[in-house]
Every structure is written in C-alpha cells, then in structure tokens.
Amino acid sequence: MSTVGEIELQPWAVQLDHDARAYEEQISYLLARSPFYRERLGSAGIRQPKDAGGLAAIAQLPFTEKQHIRASCTVDNPIGAHLCVPREEIVRIFSTSGTTGTPSYIPLTAGDLENWVTTSARSYAASGLSRGETVVTTYNAGPFVAGAALAAFDRLGVCHVPVGTGNTERLMTAVRQLKPSAVVMTPSYAAYLIEWASERGFDLPGSSVRRVLVAGEPGGGEAAFRARLEAGWGARVTEAMGIGDIGVSLWGECEAQCGMHLGGRGFVHAELVDPASGAAIAMADGARGELVLTHLRHRAAPLLRFRSRDHVEVWTSPCSCGRTAPRIRCIGRTDDMLIVRGVNVFPSAIRDVVGQFLPEVSGFILVKPQQRGVAQEPPLPVAVELAKGGLARAGLADRIRDRIRETLVVSTRIELVPHGSLQRSEYKSKLVQH
C-alpha cells in the first residue's frame, strides 16, 4: 500500500487557498529580486504585486518559455536574468542538455533542494514504495536533475541500490542477487529489458520485482504499452513525471493506476492551456492540453507560467487512494506532435495502437515524416517492427493502418520491418525519424 501524507488528503479547495497566498508572495519576490520578471511583467503592465490580480487571474500573465531564459543568459550570467539569489546561497547547479550544444543551468538553494526531495518522495511513495524494501534505480546522478531524486529514496527509508544508466549486466546482476521488490527506469528501458532477459533465458516475471516505476518520458500510462510491460515483468507498472526546470518529480501514480497525482502540491501551481492559442482550459475530467507550471515557494530562479510542452489528459474525480490533487497522464510532447490534415498526432499514441497487435509485432515503431516541420501530408509513413519468430498473420499492415485510422483519425502507410531492425534504448526511445 502507498503511504499518503496528510497534506495529500486535504480538500483541493483548501489547497488552492494556501496556493493563492503563496502565489502572491512569489509574485512579490519576483518583482523584488528578478530582473527578468520585472521586465516581462512590467511589459504586461504589472509593476506592483496587486497588479497581478492574484492566482485567479494567472492566465492574464505572460508565459515563460525555454528560449526566453536562454536569451537572458550572458557570459557574466550563464544561469540567466531570472536568478534571484547571490551565488553563495546556491548549493546545487544542475544542467540540461541543450539542443544547440549550450546547456541550461538550474540553480537551487538549500530550501529549493529540500522541496524537490519532498515532492519527489511524495510521487514515489504513491507507487507503493515504502520503508525497508529494496529498490534498484537506473537514474544517472551526474549533472542532470535526476540526481536530485536519489535523496528522495533515502527520505522514504528504502534500501536504495543506484546502478545508473548504460550498464544492463550490472542492473540484472543486482536484480538476481539482491532481489529488489521494485525497479525504477524509463519505460523504453523497461521494454528493452524484456527482450534482453528473454534472449538470455532470464525469467523476468519469476524475479523478485513486483513493482516497476517508470519515468523520464511518456509511455508508462499508455494502456497497451503498460500491459506489455506488466506481462513482460510480471509486475505492476506505475509512472512518475517531472519537468527539470520546475521539479525533478512532481507527479506520481498510485496503485489504482488512474493517472499521476500532483505530488508537487503546495510547491507548484498547474494550469492547462491550448498548445496552439495559449488559451486557458479548465482542469476537469477528460480535459486535454499543454501543462503550464508556476513555482510557489522557490527561491533561486523561480519560473512563472512555464510552458512544459507536455500534452496531458486530466482527471479531477475522486481516487480510491484518497489523494485529492488532480491527476494527469502524459499523452506526448507537443514538440514531437505532428499535424496530418489538421489532426494532431502524437507518436506515442501511434505506438499505443500498434501495441494492440502483440504478439504479431514487437511493439517498436518509428514515424517517418516526409515534410519538414510539423504539418504532414497523408499518408504518414510508420515503420512497425515484427515480433521475433514471424508470428504475423496475413494482412497485418492493413489491419494496423485501419486501427490507427479508426482510433486516431489519421491515414498512415505501414511498413513492416524485421525484428531487431529498430533501435533499442537503455534510456529514452526515439519514436520520430528527424
């Protein structure tokens, strides 16, 4: 059973009252300390905290995007103009890999780091991790924010075995010898290990592992993909999610498996917006949109209305675990999204449909856009890898094409490729050929 903290059972309306007060303090802090936000908010006519209108009016404020932060960086201030504290108050600086080769830096004060550990511990506890059990993790503790998550396992009181990324032999030796009850990894790596174990005669469903916690990329909440992982591991699969610039792990799924709860409640405020127009979307059962996050109690470099580029589905109905925060499932990244004749298509959604054809297919796919940019002309080419041993029945490509059209309302051209021809990953899968 998962451990539920008292704050997680608090009525959501009460939480919003607390958040409203914290938000007003955060706005005051930004206007006093952040040159970046003084300029951005000032250009929107907000020069005093009262001008912001409170949490109920947050949708009137400008978004913060990654490129805005990058543009504010200088040789003398490589972190960015949103930095609010002197260097001597910073205890940790993480970095994210930059698409241009220039990393982005994420500074934390001691209080910020403590808050990250708190939210991460909540999200991991939701999955059922508890004191005394052995957990093997594959997070890298190097320069990236996942390293901050390691302290969350200490907070939970588990026997934590960090093996890092890129060493499958070491990982599986730890599973064999130390007999953990849980493992933590990306969903792509969990899928890769099913094949790895099968090829080497390792009985993964017969191992000690009873829980697989996946994070780092979308996929763990897709019905067909989750079923594939649970069958291959003989274990319950739940997922967690964070956004490096905001918090390493902010959302965690409980054992009911009906979406990830906001473990970051009290520390971040979540909004839903239309990814194209930026218009607000009400957080209600079944709503879909881009996740936008705002720090509420951050000190080093708080972010206001940060566009995550994660496209999510939301649930606000009661959960059997008693947690009252909204729940989400990540459908995909809006920067991976393609538009085919006006229809938004996420590669992860195509993978989920293809996964319904197991055991005829391996479950691995690669979308191959033909036009530069987001807009694509139909049919959209998709490589689908066959299962090992040639289990496909006649007409498989047509059946997959028809199912995708029925489910996602998009026309595809299915190319069946031999087993083993699509790249596997010990970290995150590439679903789109760029």
Question: PLM features: what roles do these ranges have?
Answer:
Residues 220-221, 225-318:
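Conserved AMP-binding/adenylate-forming
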Residues 101, 201, 277-279, 427:
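Detector for glycine-centered tight turns/loop "hinges" at secondary-structure junctions
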Residues 4-6, 65-238, 246, 250-256, ...:
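Active-site phosphate/ATP/adenylate-binding loop shared across adenylate-forming ligases
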Residues 207, 264-267, 333:
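Short, solvent-exposed loop/turn segments at the edges of secondary structure
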Residues 163, 240-242, 273, 370, ...:
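Conserved beta-strand termini and adjacent loop/short-helix elements that scaffold enzyme active sites
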Residues 1-95, 101-118, 125-126, 226, ...:
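Nucleotide 5′-phosphate-binding alpha/beta core
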Residues 183, 292-408, 426-427:
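AMP-binding/adenylate-forming catalytic core of the ANL superfamily
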